[in-house]
UniProtKB/Swiss-Prot annotation:
Stated role: RNA-binding protein involved in the formation of polar-growing hyphae which is essential for infection by the plant pathogen. Component of endosomal mRNA transport that regulates polarity of the infectious hyphae by transporting a broad spectrum of cargo mRNAs from the nucleus to cell poles.
Name of the protein in its database record: Polyadenylate-binding protein 1
Organism in which the protein naturally occurs: Mycosarcoma maydis (Corn smut fungus)
SUPFAM superfamilies for the chain: PABC (PABP) domain, RNA-binding domain, RBD
Gene name linked to the record: PAB1
Compositionally biased intervals (Pro residues): 529-540
Region feature Disordered, mapped onto this chain: 1-42, 481-554, 632-651
One matching Pfam family: MLLE
């Protein structure tokens, strides 16, 4: 982690008092809950931290590396979009004790993660407490150089801060921010002492935060009772007196101005402010679209620039969405088009599937084909038929690619989601290789010695757990994938078992390593003589299996009826115990990974693989090829990730 950079606090210098004014409408809600202290009511129980302002590329593994330097981390979860799996920019870090959380906020708050300062706060699960306006203040006219850290340091002198945020966009600070204090008294003190002061040579306004709903209601009320009128398309030869006389007949005017340039020439627009709203409304109704000295006037309520831009943005988005909806499912994207093809020849190829509304091959400025284009049909059914018939068709000995057209941002999100999934898989494989707890999907560790025989129709009862895995039925803490523990961390009260190497111990299997500790009982006591040891071969002969036990109850001879009585997790465990020995017979070194990949198949197909050895062998070979191909393609990325410099923090 990069070293923590603490911006110098904005210097507060007294300035002459400024009249209290209504705060400008804020585009963002204030951040809440970010700070150094918690409410006393939560002090004893809360160990969960909210970490915000994260770069989308930040993963659970990166956060664990950072926060584990402070104390024992129970779990980490980066919140992601349910569809694209793209990071939402915030995460939750759970410590085992509150003291570690306190230290994490003191030492890591506003520190840089991927060159972006993070914001850390205690997780507040009660939305009523998160949205309360008590102790929340609004600051505007901030200098562009003031960031979250500088704002926090400036206002920390008045009380415990629960939240501190400067509103920003892609270009930087928006010039306003929010500070949420623990008490209303601290907020009042901050308003009293800082309102009208100079921060970085700019006079700031500090007042109580007004919730968005109240601000919006006040704005709507102001718009409905407007008195300021805007007029454009005014003839350049019109004088100020003529312009004012035009509006005087509608009521008393408090101000009237016709905008002019530096040379004194009229810009063709101006503003008229009436004393009464009804008079202003009457002027708009009668003068809009009227003729004045040969020009058709445009007269309407005067708007702020930000309001006009917002209306234009909304209208643009509405037109854009309407256009996208119109072509949704009917516009096709084509690539690998032969250079000899033109628009007409391409249209002839796709005409048999329906009515084409447009067909175009994209070309360079020189007129040379760029090899891709678009075909738009009148109905989705026609487009789907064209995709199924034309995708992969050979045109001039070149396979044509045909698919539904997608927007660039949608394609980018899908690509980012795919890259993120590959990175997660690589991190899980690295974690498995380094003993960082049991990996997520794609790796399978059998129970040592498998499960002993169970009565007919009963699901297995797990007695032992592999390294980093809790027995079934216990809650799993989130870390990347559900149930995965970071960096070998184990829940308190569980002892990790040694993961199996190669195939499960059986007759002729690998012997325990030199210096291995002797077998122990469940509670660590020496195992009584004669008691079977998990993972060791059972005695041969009639005593190896209880008398009268049906063969179908043995692992490897599972039935659909037995699996139907088990939960999905138990079904996978039962099938894994049956499949693993068969995979290990041919691939002892990769049995765990290959079994994990095979277990992703549906249960019905897994039962078929247990019955048909040839089908299982074919599936093992297929999984082996996929694994080798992935390892070859991903080796460069794994090496870069391993060599990445670890960021450092300082208090």
């Amino acid at each position: 982690m990069s070293s923590t950079e603490s911006p110098v606090p904005a210097a507060a210098a007294p300035a002459e008092a400024v009249p209290a004014s209504t705060p400008a409408p804020a585009a963002e809600q204030p951040a809440v809950g970010n700070g150094e202290q918690r409410n006393n009511a939560d002090a004893a129980n809360n160990t969960s931290l909210y970490v915000g302002e994260l770069d989308p590329s930040v993963t659970e593994a990166m956060l664990f590396e950072i926060f584990s330097m402070i104390g024992t981390v129970a779990s980490i979860r980066v919140c992601r979009d349910a569809v694209t799996r793209r990071s939402l920019g915030y995460a939750y870090v759970n410590f085992l004790n509150a003291a570690d959380g306190e230290r994490a906020m003191e030492q890591l708050n506003y520190s840089l993660i991927r060159n972006r300062p993070c914001r850390i706060m205690w997780s507040q699960r009660d939305p009523a407490l998160r949205r309360t306006g008590q102790g929340n203040i609004f600051i505007k006219n901030l200098d562009a150089g003031i960031d979250n850290k500088a704002l926090h340091d400036t206002f920390a002198a008045f009380g415990n801060i629960l939240s501190c945020k400067v509103a920003t966009n892609e270009t930087g600070s928006l010039g306003y921010g929010f500070v949420h204090y623990e008490t209303a008294e601290a907020a009042e003190a901050a308003i009293k002492h800082v309102n009208g002061m100079l921060l970085n040579d700019k006079k700031v306004y500090v007042g109580h935060h007004i919730p968005r709903k109240e601000r919006q209601a006040k704005i709507e009320e102001t718009r409905a009772n407007f008195t300021n009128v805007y007029a454009k398309n005014v003839d350049p030869e019109v004088t100020d007196d003529e312009f004012e006389k035009l509006f005087t007949k509608f009521g008393k005017i408090t101000s009237c101005v016709l905008q002019r340039d530096e040379d004194g020439k009229s810009k063709g627009f101006g503003f008229v402010n009436f004393e009464d709203h009804n008079e202003a409304q009457k002027a708009v109704d009668e003068l809009h679209d009227s003729d004045f000295k040969g020009q058709k006037l445009f007269v309407a309520r005067a708007q702020k620039k930000s309001e006009r831009e917002e209306e234009l943005r909304r209208s643009y988005e509405a037109a854009k969405n309407e256009k996208l909806a119109k072509f949704q499912g009917v516009n096709l994207y084509l690539k690998n088009i032969p250079e000899s093809y033109d628009d007409e020849r391409l249209r002839e190829e796709f005409a048999p599937f329906g009515a084409i509304t447009s067909c175009k091959i994209m070309r360079a400025p020189s007129g040379v084909s760029r090899g891709f284009g678009f075909v738009c049909y009148s109905a989705p059914e026609e487009a789907n038929k064209a995709v199924s018939e034309m995708n992969g068709k050979m045109l001039d000995n070149r396979p044509l690619y045909v698919a539904l057209a997608q927007r660039k941002d949608v394609r980018r999100q899908q690509l980012e989601a795919q890259i993120m999934q590959r990175n997660q898989l690589r991190l899980q494989q690295q974690a498995a290789a380094q003993g960082m707890g049991y990996p997520g999907p794609g790796m399978y560790y059998p129970q040592p010695g498998a499960f002993p025989g169970q009565p007919g129709g009963m699901v297995p009862r797990p007695r032992y757990a592999p390294a980093g895995m809790m027995p079934q039925g216990m809650p799993m803490a989130p870390y990347g994938q559900p149930g995965q523990f970071p960096a070998g961390m184990m829940p308190q009260g569980y002892r990790p078992a040694r993961p199996p190497r190669g195939a499960p111990n059986a007759a002729g299997g690998p012997a325990p390593p030199a210096g291995a500790r002797p077998p122990t009982g469940v509670n660590g006591a020496p195992r009584p003589a004669g008691q079977p040891v998990p993972g060791q071969p059972m005695p041969r002969g009639p005593a190896a299996r209880p008398a009268g036990r049906p063969e179908a109850d043995q692992p490897g001879a599972l039935t659909a009826a037995a699996l139907a009585k088990a939960s999905p997790e138990e079904q996978k465990q039962m099938l894994g115990e049956a499949i693993y020995p068969k995979v290990a017979a041919s691939q002892p070194e990769l049995a765990g990974k290959l079994t994990g990949m095979i277990l992703e198949l549906p249960v019905t197909e897994l039962l078929h693989l247990l019955e048909e050895s040839e089908a299982l062998d074919a599936k093992v070979n297929e999984a082996l090829e996929v694994l080798k191909e992935y390892q070859q393609n991903d080796s460069a990325g794994a090496e870069a990730e391993a060599n990445a410099e670890a960021p450092k923090t300082e208090a």
